[in-house]
Regions:
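Active-site helix of classical SDR
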Residues: 122, 160, 168
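Short, small/polar-rich loop/turn modules that mediate ligand/substrate recognition or access, typified
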Residues: 87, 134, 176, 181, ...
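Substrate-binding pocket helix/loop in short-chain dehydrogenase/reductase
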Residues: 97-99, 103-111, 137, 215
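Alpha-helical segment proximal to the catalytic Tyr-Lys
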Residues: 127, 173-177, 243
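Short C-terminal tail/terminal secondary-structure segment
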Residues: 4, 93-96, 234-235, 246-260
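Conserved glycine-rich cofactor-binding loop
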Residues: 14-15
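Residue(s) in the substrate-gating loop at a strand-loop-helix junction
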Residues: 142
């Protein structure tokens, strides 16, 4: 198997893209630490991996909390003995509202989960990757903030996704000498549960009409992508087949962002 003997940390690992990535990495032989804040969902995902013959453990932590993240990351390494792969998938859409409507607390929450959470994950995981002599990091960004800016009111979300890509490209240079690769996947419209935590308010005030060619997603005629399709790319970036790729965003959107 492609990742036999490797250990992976996946934040947001119990749902959506994170869960799909956890299942995919485990199926290829990786031992996976699934990190999230809902223990019951984590336990269910771990059982699913184990039922398929894989190895996994649940790590309950808030990605914005340094103490919880430090404990969780250390527990993973203590349990499996090493760390080779990090998938920073935890994130929220947050509140989408005009800039003069979204409150400071709403803004701060999106920034905290998506940007501070990414920072905290990498801040605490990179020392273990350095100790291991290398590794691969995959950050889950978005077409929003990197190619697409026409989702009205998504300013906080887009800022975090642009920020994640900046982190990836900055760290590609910083971490290269340690044989640590870092890349980003930028999904478009994907069938996940993330829309359940999107709170849209007065979006019409922040929206600009967009002229669409026929078919919202050219490759599929409008059909959304799947978390498993994103996970396939995460698997590629996690393994040795992408050994000369770093600092690179990959848009997984069926050409959707090229229309906007």
């Amino acid at each position: 198997m492609e990742l036999s003997g490797k250990v992976a940390l996946v934040t947001g690992g119990a749902s959506g893209i994170g869960k799909a990535a956890s299942l995919k990495l485990a199926a290829e032989g990786a031992m996976v630490g699934l990190l999230g804040h809902t223990k019951s969902e984590l336990d269910d995902a771990v059982r699913e991996i184990e039922a398929a013959g894989g190895k996994a453990m649940a790590l309950t932590a808030d990605v914005t909390d340094e103490s919880e993240m430090r404990t969780a990351t250390a527990s993973l390494v203590e349990h499996f003995g090493r760390l080779d792969i990090v998938v920073a998938s935890a994130g929220i859409n947050g509140v989408w509202a005009p800039i003069d409507d979204i409150t400071p607390d709403e803004w701060d929450k999106t920034i905290a989960v998506n940007l501070r959470g990414t920072y905290m994950t990498l801040h605490l995981a990179v020392p273990y990757l350095k100790k291991q002599g290398g590794g691969s990091i995959v950050v889950i960004s978005s077409i929003n903030g990197t190619r697409t800016f026409s989702n009205g009111g998504a300013t906080a979300y887009a800022a975090t996704k642009a920020g994640q890509l900046a982190i990836v490209q900055q760290l590609a240079l910083e971490l290269g000498k340690h044989r640590i690769r870092i890349n980003a996947v930028c999904p478009g419209a994907i069938v996940t549960e993330i829309d359940d935590n999107t709170h849209k308010r007065n979006q019409e005030e922040a929206s600009v009409p967009v002229e669409w060619p026929a078919g919202e997603i050219p490759l599929t005629g409008g059909e959304y992508g799947t978390a498993e399709e994103v996970a396939d790319t995460i698997l590629f970036l996690a393994g040795d087949r992408s050994r000369h790729i770093t600092g690179t965003p990959i848009w997984i959107d069926g050409g959707q962002s090229l229309l906007r």
